[in-house]
Amino acid sequence: TILGYCIGGPLLGTTLAFLAQRNEEHYNSATFLVAQVDFQKAGDLKLFIDDAQLKNIEALMAKDGYLDGARMSTVFNMLRPKDLIWPYIINNYMLGKQPAAFDLLYWNQDSTRMPAANHNYYLREFYHENKLALGKMQLGGVKLDLGKIRIPVFHLATREDHISPPKSVFTGAKMFG
């Protein structure tokens, strides 16, 4: 059994499709947690992913070799400003109140740097061009097809996820064989 969570989901789908094409299914089942493999309905995050934005991100990452986690967190926060930006500006900055500790706040601040090569490929090939879902992605000369995956697959989507919208997760879940 193998698990893919968030960005690990497209990577898992890619791996399973690659193995299936080579008749090398090494796993009995796979679980995808809030993970997209079809980015057609990827939601508001697609507002930040067009040719101009991708060029800017690529140039930014070329300097340091990674995307700083704080930048990624800022983009995610901008997807839900009513919940993740404005309460802190009003309560903390304007009213001088201390933020209440809660698990989402801690989790949201725990960002990870994204290696440039990985992030560039992910944004361009998955989000922008949706190659895996369209059957246009190749890995090592092997054309990938999610429909060739024959092991049992479980997908979990959460109702209010602003990064992996449930409609996108559901659409991708239907692509497996």
Region spans (language model):
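Glycine-rich nucleophile elbow surrounding the catalytic serine of serine-hydrolase chemistry
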Residues: 1-16
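Short, conserved loop/helix-junction motifs that constitute active-site signature segments
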Residues: 146-149, 175-177
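Alpha/beta-hydrolase-fold enzymes
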Residues: 14-119
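Mobile cap/lid helix-loop segments that gate and shape the active-site cleft of serine hydrolases
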Residues: 108-144, 151-152
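Conserved alpha/beta-hydrolase "acid-adjacent" motif
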Residues: 162-168
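Catalytic histidine neighborhood in serine/cysteine hydrolases
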Residues: 123, 169-177
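Short beta-strand/loop motif that positions the catalytic acidic residue
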Residues: 149, 155-157, 161
